Protein backbone atom coordinates (compact mmCIF):
# COMPACT_ATOMS: atom_id res chain seq x y z
CA UNK A 1 0.00 0.00 0.00
CA UNK A 2 1.54 3.32 -1.02
CA UNK A 3 1.15 6.78 0.38
CA UNK A 4 -1.50 7.81 -2.14
CA UNK A 5 -4.27 5.64 -0.65
CA UNK A 6 -7.62 7.35 -1.06
CA UNK A 7 -10.45 7.55 1.41
CA UNK A 8 -12.60 5.50 -0.98
CA UNK A 9 -10.00 2.72 -1.07
CA UNK A 10 -9.56 2.85 2.71
CA UNK A 11 -13.27 2.62 3.42
CA UNK A 12 -13.81 -0.02 0.75
CA UNK A 13 -11.01 -2.32 1.90
CA UNK A 14 -11.88 -1.95 5.57
CA UNK A 15 -15.64 -2.37 5.08
CA UNK A 16 -16.30 0.58 7.39
CA UNK A 17 -18.46 2.67 5.10
CA UNK A 18 -21.75 1.36 6.43
CA UNK A 19 -20.55 1.46 10.03
CA UNK A 20 -19.63 5.11 9.70
CA UNK A 21 -23.06 5.84 8.29
CA UNK A 22 -24.64 3.95 11.18
CA UNK A 23 -23.16 6.17 13.87
CA UNK A 24 -25.08 9.35 14.68
CA UNK A 25 -23.57 12.60 13.43
CA UNK A 26 -23.64 14.29 16.83
CA UNK A 27 -20.14 15.40 17.66
CA UNK A 28 -19.85 16.63 21.22
CA UNK A 29 -23.36 15.56 22.21
CA UNK A 30 -23.63 13.87 25.59
CA UNK A 31 -27.28 13.10 24.90
CA UNK A 32 -29.26 13.06 21.68
CA UNK A 33 -32.81 13.15 20.45
CA UNK A 34 -34.57 9.82 20.13
CA UNK A 35 -34.73 10.13 16.34
CA UNK A 36 -31.02 10.84 15.82
CA UNK A 37 -29.62 9.03 18.83
CA UNK A 38 -30.30 5.43 19.78
CA UNK A 39 -32.53 4.66 16.80
CA UNK A 40 -29.89 5.69 14.27
CA UNK A 41 -27.10 3.92 16.13
CA UNK A 42 -28.89 0.68 16.98
CA UNK A 43 -32.22 0.56 15.15
CA UNK A 44 -34.23 0.32 18.38
CA UNK A 45 -36.91 2.48 19.94
CA UNK A 46 -38.09 2.81 23.51
CA UNK A 47 -41.02 0.48 22.97
CA UNK A 48 -38.73 -2.33 21.83
CA UNK A 49 -36.34 -1.74 24.73
CA UNK A 50 -39.29 -1.91 27.14
CA UNK A 51 -40.41 -5.23 25.63
CA UNK A 52 -36.91 -6.66 25.98
CA UNK A 53 -36.67 -5.64 29.63
CA UNK A 54 -40.14 -7.00 30.31
CA UNK A 55 -39.08 -10.33 28.81
CA UNK A 56 -35.96 -10.31 30.97
CA UNK A 57 -38.14 -9.94 34.07
CA UNK A 58 -40.84 -12.38 32.99
CA UNK A 59 -39.78 -14.92 35.64
CA UNK A 60 -39.18 -12.26 38.25
CA UNK A 61 -36.05 -10.43 39.31
CA UNK A 62 -35.21 -7.27 41.20
CA UNK A 63 -33.79 -5.34 38.29
CA UNK A 64 -32.85 -5.64 34.61
CA UNK A 65 -30.93 -3.45 32.24
CA UNK A 66 -29.72 -3.52 28.66
CA UNK A 67 -26.47 -2.07 27.33
CA UNK A 68 -25.97 -1.23 23.65
CA UNK A 69 -22.63 -0.29 22.11
CA UNK A 70 -21.58 0.55 18.55
CA UNK A 71 -17.87 1.30 18.12
CA UNK A 72 -15.97 2.23 14.98
CA UNK A 73 -12.16 2.12 15.27
CA UNK A 74 -9.63 3.09 12.62
CA UNK A 75 -5.84 3.07 12.48
CA UNK A 76 -3.36 4.46 9.98
CA UNK A 77 0.41 3.92 10.15
CA UNK A 78 3.33 5.49 8.31
CA UNK A 79 6.79 3.97 7.99
CA UNK A 80 9.66 5.36 5.91
CA UNK A 81 7.27 8.09 4.81
CA UNK A 82 4.73 5.72 3.27
CA UNK A 83 1.47 4.24 4.50
CA UNK A 84 2.07 0.62 5.47
CA UNK A 85 -1.09 -0.15 7.44
CA UNK A 86 -4.71 0.96 7.38
CA UNK A 87 -7.29 -0.91 9.43
CA UNK A 88 -10.84 -0.51 10.58
CA UNK A 89 -12.78 -2.49 13.19
CA UNK A 90 -16.48 -2.51 14.00
CA UNK A 91 -18.05 -3.65 17.27
CA UNK A 92 -21.82 -3.77 17.58
CA UNK A 93 -23.94 -5.56 20.15
CA UNK A 94 -26.11 -5.51 23.22
CA UNK A 95 -26.00 -7.18 26.62
CA UNK A 96 -28.95 -7.89 28.91
CA UNK A 97 -28.49 -8.26 32.67
CA UNK A 98 -30.97 -9.50 35.27
CA UNK A 99 -30.32 -9.23 39.01
CA UNK A 100 -32.20 -11.17 41.68
CA UNK A 101 -30.78 -11.00 45.17
CA UNK A 102 -27.10 -11.92 44.94
CA UNK A 103 -27.52 -13.66 41.58
CA UNK A 104 -26.88 -12.10 38.19
CA UNK A 105 -27.83 -13.45 34.78
CA UNK A 106 -26.25 -12.05 31.62
CA UNK A 107 -26.62 -12.69 27.90
CA UNK A 108 -25.17 -10.94 24.86
CA UNK A 109 -26.12 -10.62 21.20
CA UNK A 110 -24.28 -9.15 18.23
CA UNK A 111 -27.55 -9.20 16.29
CA UNK A 112 -29.94 -6.40 17.21
CA UNK A 113 -33.18 -7.79 15.82
CA UNK A 114 -36.15 -7.99 18.18
CA UNK A 115 -36.01 -11.79 18.10
CA UNK A 116 -32.33 -11.87 19.06
CA UNK A 117 -32.75 -9.31 21.83
CA UNK A 118 -35.76 -11.13 23.30
CA UNK A 119 -33.80 -14.39 23.20
CA UNK A 120 -30.92 -12.77 25.09
CA UNK A 121 -33.37 -11.34 27.60
CA UNK A 122 -34.90 -14.77 28.19
CA UNK A 123 -31.46 -16.31 28.70
CA UNK A 124 -30.44 -13.62 31.19
CA UNK A 125 -33.75 -13.93 33.04
CA UNK A 126 -33.42 -17.69 33.49
CA UNK A 127 -31.68 -17.10 36.84
CA UNK A 128 -34.89 -15.75 38.36
CA UNK A 129 -36.89 -18.00 40.69
CA UNK A 130 -40.12 -17.72 38.69
CA UNK A 131 -41.74 -15.44 41.25
CA UNK A 132 -43.84 -13.63 38.67
CA UNK A 133 -43.16 -10.90 36.17
CA UNK A 134 -41.70 -7.65 37.47
CA UNK A 135 -42.68 -4.30 36.01
CA UNK A 136 -40.69 -1.90 33.84
CA UNK A 137 -40.82 1.79 34.69
CA UNK A 138 -41.41 4.63 32.26
CA UNK A 139 -38.15 5.76 30.74
CA UNK A 140 -36.72 9.12 31.69
CA UNK A 141 -33.55 10.30 30.00
CA UNK A 142 -30.69 11.39 32.22
CA UNK A 143 -28.27 14.11 31.22
CA UNK A 144 -24.55 14.27 31.84
CA UNK A 145 -21.77 16.80 31.21
CA UNK A 146 -20.25 16.93 27.76
CA UNK A 147 -16.77 15.51 28.32
CA UNK A 148 -15.96 15.46 24.59
CA UNK A 149 -16.52 18.96 23.18
CA UNK A 150 -15.17 18.27 19.70
CA UNK A 151 -15.93 20.51 16.75
CA UNK A 152 -15.20 17.74 14.25
CA UNK A 153 -15.37 13.98 14.57
CA UNK A 154 -12.41 11.85 13.51
CA UNK A 155 -14.73 9.80 11.30
CA UNK A 156 -15.26 13.00 9.30
CA UNK A 157 -11.51 13.45 8.70
CA UNK A 158 -10.60 11.82 5.40
CA UNK A 159 -7.50 9.73 4.81
CA UNK A 160 -6.32 12.44 2.41
CA UNK A 161 -6.11 14.80 5.41
CA UNK A 162 -4.67 12.27 7.84
CA UNK A 163 -1.70 11.23 5.71
CA UNK A 164 -0.23 14.77 5.38
CA UNK A 165 -0.54 15.20 9.15
CA UNK A 166 1.37 11.96 9.77
CA UNK A 167 4.01 13.02 7.25
CA UNK A 168 4.51 16.33 9.04
CA UNK A 169 5.08 14.44 12.28
CA UNK A 170 7.46 12.09 10.45
CA UNK A 171 9.47 14.99 9.00
CA UNK A 172 9.60 16.83 12.32
CA UNK A 173 10.96 13.73 14.05
CA UNK A 174 13.62 13.14 11.39
CA UNK A 175 14.62 16.79 11.48
CA UNK A 176 14.95 16.94 15.25
CA UNK A 177 18.24 14.99 15.34
CA UNK A 178 20.56 13.83 12.58
CA UNK A 179 21.00 10.50 14.36
CA UNK A 180 17.36 9.57 13.75
CA UNK A 181 17.20 7.48 10.59
CA UNK A 182 13.89 5.66 10.81
CA UNK A 183 10.50 6.81 12.09
CA UNK A 184 7.18 5.09 12.50
CA UNK A 185 4.06 7.20 13.05
CA UNK A 186 0.54 5.94 13.69
CA UNK A 187 -2.83 7.50 14.36
CA UNK A 188 -5.61 5.47 15.96
CA UNK A 189 -9.08 6.70 16.77
CA UNK A 190 -12.42 5.31 17.83
CA UNK A 191 -15.98 6.48 18.37
CA UNK A 192 -18.45 4.64 20.58
CA UNK A 193 -22.16 5.27 20.84
CA UNK A 194 -23.57 3.80 24.06
CA UNK A 195 -27.10 3.37 25.35
CA UNK A 196 -28.06 1.99 28.77
CA UNK A 197 -31.69 1.47 29.82
CA UNK A 198 -32.91 0.00 33.10
CA UNK A 199 -36.17 -1.48 34.32
CA UNK A 200 -36.28 1.32 36.90
CA UNK A 201 -36.83 3.80 34.06
CA UNK A 202 -33.33 5.19 33.78
CA UNK A 203 -32.23 5.90 30.22
CA UNK A 204 -28.76 7.22 29.38
CA UNK A 205 -26.85 7.75 26.14
CA UNK A 206 -23.25 8.71 25.57
CA UNK A 207 -20.85 9.35 22.71
CA UNK A 208 -17.22 8.46 23.46
CA UNK A 209 -14.48 9.61 21.07
CA UNK A 210 -10.84 8.68 21.59
CA UNK A 211 -7.67 9.29 19.58
CA UNK A 212 -3.99 8.42 19.98
CA UNK A 213 -0.96 9.61 18.02
CA UNK A 214 2.14 7.42 18.41
CA UNK A 215 5.71 8.02 17.31
CA UNK A 216 8.64 5.64 17.53
Each PLM stretch: what is its role?
Residues 2-216:
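Active-site bordering "gate/hinge" segments
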Amino acid sequence: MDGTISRREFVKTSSCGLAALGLPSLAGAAAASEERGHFQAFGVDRELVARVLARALLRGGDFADIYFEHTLSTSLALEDGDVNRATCDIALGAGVRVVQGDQTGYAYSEVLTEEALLSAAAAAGAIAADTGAAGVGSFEATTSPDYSPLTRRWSEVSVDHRIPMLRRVNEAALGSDHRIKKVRVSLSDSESWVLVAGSDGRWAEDWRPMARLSLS
